[in-house]
């Protein structure tokens, strides 16, 4: 899996003084990891926002530091934003070992067309938006692709055990959980009963009797 690059620089201010670099269009960040001393760094805020949007929590990010000869492979671990204005306050990156398996939440992406879904009265049942995947960092898929064209009958159900990921990646969710199926939509038919206005008001209906003119002579 190809990573996304981001350039970082060492940070010289800490604590409440971080607001000074935020005013300059920079965001404080940290890199930490197993057996790694935490690094206090800073990033261009616009570039960092772009990286967050592209990488999410499941894409590798290649961190470039002026002091390093090699790039660092990291995942975005935590994003802190101002609760009122929403701007970035701080981001944590977790540096990984490429030889050790990692676990990540991978989004499900549906593509293709189902002949059933083109018809009225059918809908897609998809309980999950993400699945938990374990793999070596370079083998983590950016998405789990599901082709909707396979759902051509109502009997077609797709379970986690039916999904095979490339590169030795493994889905950790229970194998018998349903991932997708097409189901019929059962419409509720509402019946309207006509109510006599007199009955609705609680009054007894009055019988209308037509008087026929007598044809007999008196």
From Swiss-Prot:
Keyword field contains Magnesium: no
One CC-aspect GO term: cytosolic large ribosomal subunit
Keyword RNA-binding belongs to the record: yes
Source species, domain of life: Bacteria
Stretch list, region Disordered: 197-218
GO process annotations (BP): translation
Listed InterPro entries: Rbsml_bL25/Gln-tRNA_synth_N, Ribosomal_bL25/Gln-tRNA_synth, Ribosomal_bL25_b-dom, Ribosomal_bL25_C, Ribosomal_bL25_long, Ribosomal_L25_dom, Ribosomal_uL5_bac-type
GO molecular function: 5S rRNA binding; structural constituent of ribosome
Quaternary structure, from the entry: Part of the 50S ribosomal subunit; part of the 5S rRNA/L5/L18/L25 subcomplex. Contacts the 5S rRNA. Binds to the 5S rRNA independently of L5 and L18.
Function: This is one of the proteins that binds to the 5S RNA in the ribosome where it forms part of the central protuberance.
Family, as annotated: Belongs to the bacterial ribosomal protein bL25 family. CTC subfamily.
Protein name, entry field: Large ribosomal subunit protein bL25
Organism: Dehalococcoides mccartyi (strain ATCC BAA-2100 / JCM 16839 / KCTC 5957 / BAV1)
